[in-house]
């Protein structure tokens, strides 16, 4: 019997790709550094940014210094811009996300989040409209472990006091999250409502059941 529903965040609860993007390419432009030089340096820091080793500000300072472009005002501008674009994702929620969460809670289900996220994303999530609606928010930046490591799933299950076969995991499929959830014994469903061919990194796949809309999740619960 399903007792808890655990969600990925990006491209599941919210999407980057309907708000202005501020990824490595846009940062390189603001820094005045060729993208061909900036992007390898930026991408090489992803694990450290995801597991709390380094904050956004730490990494920006390092990269600006490496590129001989360090300026405190520029760093502050870039960090603020990155945070603002994360906040802007909440302006483009699928209209059924909040009704889905309300419907799940009305059924007495526990709700959890497992997200690979950076310092600025974790800060926004903690202050977001989602924060009071979830019983467990397991954020990689805070925990020092990221999907698909089973440890972050186990941590969430411990917080929710549920077993794997009592969990429904919902995600777009990035970071091999669906495979990890299934391997642990969870029911895994791919969220495809934000996925767009040629735009989003993840695409619909045939090896997992799909939810075309958030409300489809209700069909994957106990009869």
Descriptions of predicted regions:
Residues 2-99, 107, 123:
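N-terminal helical cap/lid subdomain that shapes the substrate entry/recognition surface
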Residues 1-5, 33, 76, 98, ...:
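Asp-based, Mg2+/Mn2+-dependent phosphohydrolase catalytic module
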